[in-house]
Amino acid sequence: MDNEKGLLIVLSGPSGVGKGTVRKRIFEDPSTSYKYSISMTTRQMREGEVDGVDYFFKTRDAFEALIKDDQFIEYAEYVGNYYGTPVQYVKDTMDEGHDVFLEIEVEGAKQVRKKFPDALFIFLAPPSLDHLRERLVGRGTESDEKIQSRINEARKEVEMMNLYDYVVVNDEVELAKNRIQCIVEAEHLKRERVEAKYRKMILEAKK
């Protein structure tokens, strides 16, 4: 039988909810076979991050040139910085039968939903907004004003939860990782994803 086309897995949620931490734990698991689509951003690199591994870090001018060339599946400006997902890698990798994993902002996920309605959308939620504030403060990288801005934005993003297929609460990183892996496995077993393949098998058997 032909290889099944890869699944586009979209993980997003409020800033500070732990998207990057959960994504890293998923890809540290030897059983993970997803391909990670690295996003581009104009924000400053944080301690421990590596260009071309965590993000492609670009200047604002360089990013805007790529926007004009229509090189993104999605892009968004969030708290003064651009974030975007390069388009060609995602399409090529899915056509090869690989699942592609995107870790993006909520505004970007809305754009992906329009272009890839069959993608799998997972919202990573904090146990509470107070818990989210503690995480942001614990980073020690932003002012109180910036943190409050992110909390205000998080309230709006939680209200957009209905755009997603699944919600995973990040109360513990290992549990969140396991839940996401189970969701992806179940998604591959959906009747609408495998039906065409088996119909083709039946037709070929009748020849």
From Swiss-Prot:
UniProt-listed Enzyme Commission number(s): 2.7.4.8
The record ties this protein, via PROSITE patterns, to: GUANYLATE_KINASE_1 (PS00856), GUANYLATE_KINASE_2 (PS50052)
HAMAP family reported for this sequence:
Guanylate_kinase
Which protein is depicted?
A: Guanylate kinase
Keyword Zinc in record: no
Q: Which Pfam families match?
A: Guanylate_kin (PF00625)
Q: Its biological function?
A: Essential for recycling GMP and indirectly, cGMP.
Keywords (alphabetical) are: ATP-binding, Cytoplasm, Kinase, Nucleotide-binding, Transferase
| Species of the source | Staphylococcus aureus (strain bovine RF122 / ET3-1)
Select a single GO molecular function from the record's annotations and give it: guanylate kinase activity
UniProt: ATP binding residues: G13, P14, S15, G16, V17, G18, K19, G20
Q: Where in the cell is it found?
A: Cytoplasm
Give the record's GO CC terms.
cytosol
Name the family the entry cites: Belongs to the guanylate kinase family.
> What residue stretches are annotated with the Guanylate kinase-like domain?
6-185
Catalysed conversion reaction: GMP + ATP = GDP + ADP
